[in-house]
Swiss-Prot record:
Site residues (Subject to oxidation and hydroselenide loss to dehydroalanine), renumbered to this chain: U47
A GO molecular function held by the record: peroxidase activity
InterPro entries in the record: Glutathione_peroxidase, GPX_AS, GPX_CS, Thioredoxin-like_sf
Gene responsible for this protein: Gpx1
Note: In the absence of Sod1, Gpx1 in the liver undergoes a 40% reduction in catalytic activity as a result of the decomposition of Sec-47 to dehydroalanine.
CDD domains: GSH_Peroxidase (cd00340)
Name by which UniProt lists this protein: Glutathione peroxidase 1
GO cellular component: cytoplasm; cytosol; Lewy body; mitochondrion
Disruption phenotype: Mutants are healthy, fertile and show no increased sensitivity to hyperoxia. Mice display enhanced susceptibility to paraquat and cortical neurons from Gpx1-deficient mice are more susceptible to H2O2-mediated toxicity than neurons from wild-type mice. Gpx1-deficient mice are smaller than wild type littermates and the liver has increased mitochondrial H2O2 production, increased lipid peroxides, and decreased mitochondrial energy output.
Function statement: Catalyzes the reduction of hydroperoxides in a glutathione-dependent manner thus regulating cellular redox homeostasis. Can reduce small soluble hydroperoxides such as H2O2, cumene hydroperoxide and tert-butyl hydroperoxide, as well as several fatty acid-derived hydroperoxides. In platelets catalyzes the reduction of 12-hydroperoxyeicosatetraenoic acid, the primary product of the arachidonate 12-lipoxygenase pathway.
Length: 201
């Protein structure tokens, strides 16, 4: 079953995919981001690393956005039910609960989606097939089987909230990072891609 899903993601870039912003409106085509370096994360409001990862995502977008980085967050409730609110509740949860203190993401958040299983968003099926394991933890798997609430279960499944996918300015996925790899520590790899981007322009 997992191998059969490869054909569904027989694309070479992320530009074939689109997603609807959390705030509503028309779907955003990732094709509109050609030439940008993309950092894509599956996020959750109630995770143990929510504060760390959201603030680091904001930091990278603020500092590197003007040079061509675009951070994209996809809320997902598949890991410990840690994004169990409705789409319209997520921004208030971030603002008042975690991270709290009036926090507002300065990057694009999309509507809740699934990232594993039969109902996975096609973008994440593509990303998982393009980069089957995190570069920093090739043996990463869901640590507790009772949390697996999707089917089919595949070897390339995302293991938890805040896995990261770095995509080059040509739309090709470059590297995948586990939940344990801090968002801010991706900066050197982003810098490398940004320098390649400016060298090609």
């Amino acid at each position: 079953m997992c191998a059969a899903r490869l054909s569904a993601a027989a694309q070479s870039t992320v530009y074939a995919f689109s997603a609807r912003p959390l705030t509503g409106g028309e779907p955003v085509s990732l094709g509109s981001l050609r030439g940008k370096v993309l950092l894509i994360e599956n996020v959750a409001s109630l995770u143990g690393t929510t504060i760390r990862d959201y603030t680091e995502m904001n930091d990278l977008q603020k500092r590197l956005g003007p040079r061509g980085l675009v951070v994209l967050g996809f809320p997902c409730n598949q890991f410990g039910h840690q994004e169990n609110g409705k789409n319209e509740e997520i921004l208030n949860s971030l603002k008042y609960v975690r991270p709290g203190g009036g926090f507002e993401p300065n990057f694009t958040l999309f509507e809740k989606c699934e990232v594993n299983g039969e109902k996975a968003h096609p973008l994440f099926t593509f990303l998982r097939n393009a980069l089957p394991t995190p570069s920093d933890d090739p043996t990463a798997l869901m640590t507790d089987p009772k949390y697996i609430i999707w089917s089919p279960v595949c070897r390339n499944d995302i293991a938890w909230n805040f896995e990261k996918f770095l995509v080059g300015p040509d739309g090709v996925p470059v590297r995948r990072y586990s939940r344990r790899f801090r968002t801010i520590d991706i900066e050197p790899d982003i810098e490398t891609l940004l320098s390649q981007q400016s060298g090609n322009s």
